[in-house]
Amino acid sequence: MSLYLPEGFIIKTEDNIKYLSSFENFKEAFKKGVPLEARASSCDKEHNLHIDFGFIEGIIPRGECAVGIDEGTTRDIAIIARVNKPVKFIITDIKEIDGKLTAILSRKILQNRFYQLKLPESKVGDIIDAAVTHLENFGVFCDIGSGINALLPIDNISVSRIPHPNVRFSVGEKIKVIIKNIDE
């Protein structure tokens, strides 16, 4: 189900393109609660993400950008880093702001659904889709669904010793991973 795929996996799908092609289709996605994906075009000084759909402006308010932002467990850099990258969201409202129609979006709702619905049914040994988001000397950070990150340690990447994860992976690469353990 596209709800649980990593960000970037549905941006070019037929359904996503259809729902983002016109205001009428966009409203249909709103009514149905369909998860959509588009590139964040900017981040303002309040750390709200903006998406320009052409026919309407979209805003993901700071607190709706990621799980943990309001609590302080997720840093604002996690929001800023999404600029010019695909973000998955649902439309929570369409209203007039400063004289123009604006779509209010939420990424956090989809992340909460992932934690509440997908993670509990996942088990060690499951093979899942992931997208490489960041490379470090000690491993690869991957989006495992709706912007939720997981670590693939360097010692689990290859049977032979490698000097850095960039020998095997690059940022943005779509991969399959096996769940080794799940932190509570």
Task: Give the residues covered by each predicted segment.
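Single-stranded RNA-binding regions, centering on S1/OB-family and related RNA-binding modules
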Residues: 1-184
